[in-house]
Amino acid sequence: MKTAELELNREIMSEAEWLVARKDLLTREKEFTRQRDALSAARRQLPMVKVEKQYVFDGPKGKETLSDLFDGRSQLVVYHFMFGPDWQEGCKSCSYLADHFDGANWHLPHRDVSFVATSRAPLSKLQAYKKRMGWRFKWVSSEKNDFNFDYHVSFTAEDEKKNKAYYNYADGEYINDEMPGLSVFFKDETGDVFHTYSTYARGLDILVGAYNFLDLVPKGRDEDNLDFTMEWLRRHDEY
């Protein structure tokens, strides 16, 4: 059996020596926090794009427009959950993220924010999977509109045939018919809706509290020797 020292390949030192190293890292952590705060401020200052198209979703209350999803608030966060029309269950990586949504959603309404997930699977599949996972957040189906295509997280058979897809603000190879993302919208006092922000791929890391915990421990995410990141991951009822 490997010892902890060999397994982690970390230097062992005295408490006093460790404190010097820790304070050096703390300086870097504080600088990173300041940079993150500045980046968040810049994000909030991005220009907005008015949403001209009328999107109608299938939701627990029946037909709901994008405007309806604000639920009386001025800000809306939409998570694009990978769950295609012919899929039998939701993406396991999106499920990993979704395990964090309900905790945050206790607090978001108190900051004038509504949260909803959307997928192209029919509502009946979404509701069944939501029940299986024990989630409470609102989930609507975009099966009958272009929402996920317009926000570049769903792709067509033609995209697959050409092996091309526009994702994360760049043209690239086709990967899947569904990809993950998050979009943010604002509604003004007149009822006009604006798109303010979308993020994809590693931009979603900030949502994953479990990864943030793993980033604190000696082995970190421990994914370097896997065939792909998240290979270890299971839906929470499959471990």
What does each model-identified segment do?
Residues 119, 141-143:
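Residues at the C-termini of beta-strands that transition into short coil/loop
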Residues 1-76, 81-111, 128-131, 138, ...:
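Non-globular targeting/processing and membrane-anchoring segments
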